[in-house]
Swiss-Prot record:
HAMAP family: TMP_synthase. Transmembrane segments: none annotated. Its cofactor is Mg(2+). NCBIfam families: thiE. Pathway: Cofactor biosynthesis; thiamine diphosphate biosynthesis; thiamine phosphate from 4-amino-2-methyl-5-diphosphomethylpyrimidine and 4-methyl-5-(2-phosphoethyl)-thiazole: step 1/1. This is Thiamine-phosphate synthase. One of its GO terms (biological process) is thiamine diphosphate biosynthetic process.
């Protein structure tokens, strides 16, 4: 079941986040699996599997196979495995959680499908969206962002630390996790509001164990 401590440092990634790796699709897949294991060994508190963008896998069978490998690693190290967006995949794999955005399946539908099976995270980009979600008991936490500019969400308006503050000040009690452009250097600004989710801060770090350690301790 859901424990808000798992939001402390969530690694979010798919094979597309290793575009800086030389080689083809399989090299990116292997880089993801190697990085995930290193990150789990270094004590990330959760992993969110996210296949999105031009370089993401397109074949559902390949996506499922990769998701299963990631899930196995999470089980080995006792970290929650969360599927981004793909509710059906989360159900098939009996994932621990599912995370959806405002443009994905309607949250009411996600709740109907996943309630009592997965914990549910919902992305919000405005205070209004957060206020709308506050009474949805089945939503375990809110993902807030992008806090800083980020290549993974080029089309999204940066919301800044201000939105985290507004949500907290509004009296919303749900746990929050900040995402978008978070690095070891700006993570300390966010800790008072809840957890942090990162992609490139781990995926592109030269020393991944050091990056995780710094993000955990700073944050």
């Amino acid at each position: 079941m859901f424990d808000a401590d798992c939001l402390k440092l969530m690694f979010v990634a798919g094979s597309q986040d290793f575009y800086h790796i030389k080689g083809g699709k399989n090299d990116r897949i292997n880089a993801l699996l190697d990085t995930l294991e290193l990150a789990l060994q270094s004590k990330i508190t959760a992993f969110q599997f996210r296949q999105k963008g031009d370089l993401a896998l397109q074949d559902p069978t390949q996506i499922k196979q990769l998701a299963m490998k990631c899930q196995k690693l999470c089980q080995k190290y006792g970290a929650p495995f969360i599927v981004n967006d793909e509710v059906q995949l989360a159900l098939e794999l009996k994932a621990d959680g599912v995370h959806v955005g405002q443009e994905d399946m309607a949250i009411e539908e996600v709740i109907t499908l996943c309630k009592k099976r997965q914990f549910i995270g919902l992305s919000v980009n405005t205070l209004e969206q957060a206020l709308k979600a506050r009474h949805l008991d089945a939503v375990a936490y809110l993902g807030v962002g992008p806090i800083f500019p980020t290549p993974s969400k080029k089309d999204k308006q940066v919301v800044g630390v201000e939105l985290l503050k507004k949500i907290k000040d509004s009296g919303i009690k749900k746990p929050l996790i900040a995402i978008g452009g978070i690095t070891m250097h700006n993570a300390p600004k966010l800790r008072e509001y809840g957890g942090i989710a990162v992609i490139s801060a781990i995926a592109q770090a030269k020393d991944k164990a050091l990056a995780v350690g710094k993000l955990l301790n700073n944050a």
